[in-house]
């Protein structure tokens, strides 16, 4: 039986020419902008995208004119394929090429009979994980392609995954004393209304932090303090709290090590928002040592964790 694994993520522009596409596709997603009428949602999405276009392009210019996410994803695929040639590995992005329809068409052409959907979001959310999974099944139906499927839609409590995160945290410390640092686990924010409607994201972020805190204790790694924050708030609605701005103000003049807990791959919100925008805010607050740990990207330990999760969830 021919088996494949498809990594699911939101995507990001590969050039400045794709920024408008990325914004319009994202805000036209009913899981992001819950307007029932496709026509009116499309109008609102275009309006929001047009308002944000120039600012977004300016931000991307500061990190090389593109999102690093596509490159990291490709490198991870190469690593997985070399470690596990028994399966075909590919990926699908929700809002930019290579999009889900392209990936599904490739799987159908290869006559893949069994597909594991692997979310690159470690915690489950309707706005991210579910959106990507729904799109996969929609595109399969359009092609009348119905392979056996298995979904790995969260793995925030997996010990192998969390050990890979500890490795990244230690790399960022670089041998310095962790007791001198406040460790902040920063997660992408969501509107409070999404959580109130039953989305499990906030609970799973907290559970992930608890699992990592326990692992740090078991390994004898002690920080001055461990806390959490939410980043990337947009608009006037109430979002998850505390915000990263608030948490940094509380720890002004301290040494800060930040880990982006909601991301497995570095992207514009780590490379620009955390490493550039918040670096400037940290400096303004008197934080003289501000560090952002790298995401897992194509680390060998992360790749092995993915393969093990897939093997454990193998379709019988």
Curated annotation (Swiss-Prot):
GO cellular component assignments: cytoplasm
Intracellular or extracellular location(s): Cytoplasm
Pfam families: Ferrochelatase
Enzyme class (EC, first level): lyase
Chief location of this protein within or outside the cell: cytoplasm
Reactions listed under catalytic activity: heme b + 2 H(+) = protoporphyrin IX + Fe(2+)
Record key words, sorted: Cytoplasm, Heme biosynthesis, Iron, Lyase, Metal-binding, Porphyrin biosynthesis
PROSITE patterns per UniProt: FERROCHELATASE (PS00534)
EC number: 4.98.1.1
Function recorded in the entry: Catalyzes the ferrous insertion into protoporphyrin IX.
PANTHER family: FERROCHELATASE, FERROCHELATASE, MITOCHONDRIAL
Protein name per Swiss-Prot or TrEMBL: Ferrochelatase
Gene designation per UniProt: hemH
